[in-house]
């Protein structure tokens, strides 16, 4: 993960938590390893299945400031919190990745979690390559975002040529010394 992507001066009052399994790239490299590298505490709790009530309670009781919530967890939390009661959370950042969240879930996050959700895109072999991160760029709903600092990301068409025009589909090509391939 590029250093520019994480602030190197996070307050020591921060703590991270994720329900994502640490055997998955999202849990391991989006939360656990960067937190430990920067000396930020990580809340750990093993659960047999995701419980939205427990998730809200844990984040509130331990004053979690930063979390990575997979899209499935966010959808379950939204369904659990149908009455739109705002929990007493102190979140500063919420990251998510694995699939597109959609505008409705992004709006719910801003309203109930009281913070914008930063979407990430990547693969196990090349994680966190593109992000829709409101703290370093203007967010565009329903967009994959922009390259994370430290990555050179381009699109190629079926003929293998780089695509320069906007709103075209293609294969994602990543040039970085940061991937796991």
What are these regions (language model features)?
Residues 1-65, 80:
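Conserved AMP-binding/adenylation subdomain of ANL enzymes
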Residues 12-13, 91, 114, 169:
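Phosphate-coordination loops involved in phosphoryl transfer and adenosine-cofactor binding
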Residues 29, 71-74:
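Membrane-embedded alpha-helices of multi-pass transport/permease systems
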Residues 37, 64-69, 78-139, 152, ...:
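Gly/Ser/Thr-rich phosphate-binding loop
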Residues 142-148:
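Short Gly/Pro-enriched turn/cap motifs at secondary-structure boundaries
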Residues 154-175:
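Conserved beta-loop-beta connector loops within the AMP-binding
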Residues 178-181:
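Conserved ANL (AMP-binding/adenylate-forming) active-site segment centered on the GW(Y/F)…HTG consensus within
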């Amino acid at each position: 993960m590029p250093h520019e992507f994480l602030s190197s001066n996070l307050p020591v009052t921060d703590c991270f938590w994720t329900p994502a399994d640490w055997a998955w790239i999202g849990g391991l490299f989006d939360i656990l390893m960067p937190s430990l590298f920067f000396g930020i505490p990580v809340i750990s709790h093993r659960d047999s299945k995701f419980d939205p009530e427990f998730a809200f309670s844990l984040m509130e009781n331990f004053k979690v400031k930063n979390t990575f919530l997979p899209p499935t967890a966010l959808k379950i939390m939204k369904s659990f919190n149908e009455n739109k009661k705002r929990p007493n959370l102190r979140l500063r950042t919420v990251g998510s990745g694995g699939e597109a969240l959609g505008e409705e879930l992004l709006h719910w996050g801003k309203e109930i979690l009281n913070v914008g959700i930063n979407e990430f895109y990547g693969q196990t072999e090349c994680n966190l390559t593109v992000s829709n991160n409101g703290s370093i760029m203007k967010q565009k709903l329903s967009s994959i975002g922009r390259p994370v600092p430290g990555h050179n990301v381009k699109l190629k068409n079926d003929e293998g040529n780089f695509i320069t025009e906007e709103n075209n589909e293609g294969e994602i090509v990543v040039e970085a010394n940061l991937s796991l391939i």
